[in-house]
A protein has these predicted regions:
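Conserved ATP-binding/catalytic motifs of P-loop helicase motor domains
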Residues: 1-939
Length: 939
């Protein structure tokens, strides 16, 4: 793996650290090597010893061999070096150093050099203009590579420091300029996966067996050499333990996670300033003394077996094509636009040790992805043909159906006198609209639901069939509580309402919380509207949270189509004028200003390590010591904060007698895998729980089973009766882990999946009236059999995603960090107040990313016409949809076919008619797809 730290002085760094192997021996030094295309440009080659004048010149920002400044700026506090550190797996370090396998050291050197060479491609300098900050890629660095074999705690730890000067050669200006690390850091996962894959390949070639290491969610994080136990690896990780202890102390003092810069400080402060005076033989002897005779013999056997197998294995067939297909499917399930380096990183991660990098790059040019930027493949951003077709078809549909219908609500509109002037105007604008698609847009709390009820009533009075849906169960439940018959959008699209399809002709389909709609869902909804000549009314706010699935559909329509938007602007939910003004700022995209307005009210509270206790204090105060929890909504952006806050709050509620005696329940933690992860048998472990959301061969909808074993690429689940093979490719089930959860009378539970048996819905919060022998009874009389259903967690707090569509009197936000969307959604839920508890107010305000995802059409604009070659390739990809056309709604398949059939001139003329939809960049400029055969991979 790679990490990066900034060095702002480094006066003794070469002599005291880089040239010593993390310990001091008078006769032993580490000799570095110059690396990088920038080093070659300066004529720097060969070895770097302690006191090297060229290294010292670079530290002082001087051209080696002269007193001339290298880059223009010499400011005090300037970053001197960026230290990119590439570390081997702990098992590799143990076998290479403690057990003396020098072949592994050579393999590390080669893998690290290759990985850093890939990272160098992302070197850049700042190219700021009046329009804002930008980076110009230079792809060259001046660096010294220093390989060490021990940690400061003298444990085996093979790692290489690539100490990179803060300078890069810019060909455009023919000058040396300061290096910006942003692009390199953004691609650091790719470089890390290049290293891991090459190292795994070398381990296999040297005769070792390897095993993939996974995190708690089942995702691959790396590999280790088989036979080196986790206990031994942990024993030789004392330096890591020291750093972790330092991080824990920081967390206890400040109540938040340290930043990367703070972790670097902790790392520096927790190591001995003075190097241990010891020789390498003494270090190795000390390491081996920590192993028992049995462990030492076992590791010797692992090495002996590897030596016997080295060079004798027949290399497995390359899995580059398979890995790329899996990577593309995995990433594009939740993103519309992905950079090339992220696709390559995930492809490597799919099959570590079985990928040849050059072949992977070659195969990447055959994927059939649509290039959106004019750059080399690894830097380019891509969309899939399907993704681009979905966006293009939806935008075209909205545009071509404008003004093509009768007024939505007829002529005689009778609205309630209780509506405000703005609300009345909005309702009238929707009801007189002659567009097939219209959007009622407004910030949180402007009264969209009030206007919707009026529109719904007018349509019903006019005899129009109305279908209401929402992307989430909780949002659909909110509609039902407002008196509107509603279902989830997925249920509407999946055909559960087929018995009512004849009523869709001429109907109105209302989609609430449309900002949570994905591109696929939105396009399918419009396709149904086209098929049945139905009208569509979207309600939502694209500044709030978006779908988990790929595509921010409402934002795409707002940005790229002529969508008729009826706007509500007057916020009504907040009773306090200053609170309302703060929410208005948040709704307008000024997240920092909005939070500062709340801070002016004294509602943003910094509690350092005690911020959770402060949040609990406010929750108890606002809820009458926990006896009226429905008055307060606690919002925790992360599940880690959710668990910590809930633990603190439940302890307080027990002390107040609000919670009764508890019973430990086996609850299920959903893993939220993508389809690719679900299909991969290697991701499963015995004891995992699978729940069928729809029927599949041999399984009924609602059925739950436990994974019993994994064998020969198949997953088997327990009875009843004999084991059954899990239909991995069915897409009919979800996967969860089991965890213990205490449940007591008075508890609130957040339901995380639908359960027909008990009648609870995903996103719903229920109150526990009692629990006995695994049976939970809710306050409204429903019964949850935890032997059959366990997808729930404590519900005194919800994530900001789950809070969307909710309204309460008081909000308590518990957050170390927030995105702009999370801040807006969470803080706008309250009528009377919103209190934000954070460990570090300045850190919270300084980091508020907007959370927007890119769409394919964001890269396309009218100021540039399409290059002929780019258009040819786009059309070829559209034609190649033939074998995969069933993946798309019929209407979208048709647009892909039309894209193929139309002549180039016709297409360009068509797109030129709508300037806001034109093309900013050439499409597919650097992808190598032959129009006569199309792409070789399914998308």
């Amino acid at each position: 793996m790679f990490t990066m730290a900034k060095i702002k002085d480094g006066g003794t760094y070469l002599k005291n650290h880089l040239s010593a192997n993390d310990y001091y021996s008078e006769k032993e030094t580490v000799i570095g090597q110059w690396v990088g295309r920038g080093a070659e440009h300066l004529g720097l080659r060969g070895e770097i010893a302690a006191g090297d004048p060229a290294f010292e010149a670079l530290r002082k920002n001087r051209r080696p061999g002269s007193s001339e400044k290298l880059t223009p700026r010499d400011g005090e506090g300037r970053v001197r070096f960026f230290d990119f550190q590439c570390s081997a797996q702990k098992s590799v370090s143990i076998m290479a150093v403690t057990m003396g396998d020098t072949g592994l050291l050579a393999a590390h050197d080669a893998a690290a050099a290759l990985a850093f060479g890939e990272l160098e491609r992302f070197a850049a300098r700042q190219a700021n203009t009046y329009a804002g900050r930008a980076n110009q890629r230079t792809s060259n660095v001046v660096a010294g590579a220093f390989r060490h074999t021990a940690s400061r705690a003298l444990d085996p730890q093979v790692h290489t420091h690539f100490v990179t000067a803060n300078a890069t050669w810019d060909l455009g200006t023919k000058s040396w300029l300061a290096l910006t690390e942003f692009e390199m850091v953004s691609a650091i996962r790719y470089a890390g996966k290049v290293y891991q894959n090459e190292m795994a390949r070398s381990c296999l070639a040297l005769g070792y067996d390897i095993e993939h290491i996974r995190d708690q969610k089942g995702a691959v994080t790396g590999f280790e050499i088989a036979g080196v136990s986790a206990d031994i690896r942990e024993r030789f990780s004392k330096r890591r333990a020291e750093v972790e202890a330092g991080i824990a102390e920081f967390r206890a003092e400040y109540g938040r996670e340290p930043t990367p810069a703070e972790i670097h400080t902790i790392t520096t402060e927790t190591r001995n300033a003075k190097l241990a005076e010891v020789t390498t033989p003494e270090v190795l002897a000390a390491q081996r003394s920590q192993l028992s005779s049995v462990e030492l013999a076992h590791l010797e056997a692992v090495r002996t077996q590897a030596s016997a197998q080295a060079g004798q294995r027949v290399p497995a067939p390359g899995r580059e094509t398979q890995s790329l297909a899996a990577s593309i499917s995995h990433l594009y399930e939740r993103q519309s636009v992905v950079p090339g380096h992220a696709i390559l990183a995930e492809a490597l991660n799919q099959n570590l040790g079985e990928i040849e990098l050059r072949r992977l790059h070659a195969k990447a040019n055959e994927t059939g992805l649509v290039g959106l930027t004019d750059e080399p493949w690894v830097h380019q951003k891509f969309a899939t043909v399907e993704g681009l077709a979905l966006e293009k078809w939806a935008v075209d549909f909205v545009d071509r159906t404008r003004g093509q219908c009768e007024p939505l609500g007829g002529e005689n509109v009778q609205l309630s006198p209780r509506l405000s002037a703005e609300q009345r105007h909005a309702a009238e604008a929707v009801l007189v609209s002659q567009d097939q698609v219209v959007c009622l847009r407004g910030a949180a709390g402007v009264g969209k639901s009030t206007v919707l009820r009026e529109i719904y009533g007018e349509l019903a009075n006019a005899g129009v069939s109305v279908f209401c849906c929402a992307p989430t169960s909780s949002a659909a439940d909110t509609l039902r509580k407002d008196g509107l018959a509603a279902t989830t959008l997925s249920a509407f699209l999946s055909g559960s309402l087929n018995h009512e399809q004849e009523n869709l002709r001429g109907a109105v389909i209302i989609c609430d919380e449309a900002g949570l709609t994905s591109n696929r869902q939105g396009a399918e909804l419009l396709a149904i509207a086209e098929q049945h000549e139905a009208r569509v009314l979207f309600l939502g706010d694209s500044r709030q949270h978006t779908a988990v699935e790929a595509g921010d559909f409402l934002r795409v329509l707002e940005s790229h189509s002529k969508l008729h938007r009826v706007q509500l602007t007057a916020i009504r939910r907040q009773e306090n004028k200053a609170y309302r003004a703060a929410v208005r700022c948040l709704a307008g995209g000024a997240a920092r200003v909005g939070l500062e307005r709340l801070d002016d009210l004294g509602w943003v509270k910094e509690g350092r390590a005690g911020y959770l206790r402060g949040a609990v204090d406010d929750f108890m105060r606002l809820s009458g010591d926990g006896r009226s929890p429905g008055q307060v909504l606690a919002v925790t952006p992360t599940w880690a904060e959710h668990e910590a806050f809930t633990g603190e709050l439940r302890a307080r509620l027990k002390a107040k007698g609000v919670l009764g005696p508890g019973e430990t329940i086996a609850a299920h933690e959903p893993l939220k895998w993508t389809a690719v992860q679900t299909r991969n048998a290697r991701n499963y472990e015995p004891g995992m729980i699978v729940t069928f959301n729809q029927p599949a061969k041999g399984f009924k909808a609602g059925e739950r089973s436990e994974v019993s074993r994994i064998a020969d690429g198949s997953v088997f689940v327990a009875g009843p009766g004999a084991e059954r093979r899990l239909p991995l490719r069915s897409g009919a089930f979800s996967v969860a882990r089991t965890r213990e959860l205490e449940v007591a009378a008075g508890d609130r539970l957040l339901i995380r999946a639908n359960d027909r048996g008990s009648g609870v819905l995903n996103g719903e919060v229920v109150t526990v009236a009692g629990v006995k022998a695994g049976m939970i009874e809710t306050a409204d009389g429903r019964r949850i059999d935890t032997g059959r259903f366990g997808e729930f967690s404590h519900g005194f707090a919800v994530t900001s995603h789950a809070s969307q569509s909710k309204t309460v009197e008081h909000v308590v936000v518990v957050a170390e960090r927030l995105t702009a969307k999370a801040a807006y959604v969470a803080c706008s839920r309250g009528r009377a107040s919103c209190v934000v508890h954070t460990p570090d107010k300045a850190a919270l305000l300084d980091r508020l990313p907007n959370g927007n995802r890119e769409a394919a059409l964001d890269f396309l604009g009218a100021e540039h016409s399409l290059a002929k070659t780019a258009l040819d390739r786009t059309l070829a990809w559209a034609k190649a949809l033939g074998g995969r056309a069933t993946m798309l709604p019929k209407a979208v398949r048709e647009v892909a076919e039309r894209m193929w059939r139309r002549k180039h001139a016709t297409l360009e003329a068509k797109w030129a008619e709508t300037p806001h939809q034109g093309w900013n960049h050439h499409i597919g400029h650097s992808t190598n797809i032959h129009a006569d055969r199309g792409p070789s991979l399914g998308l």
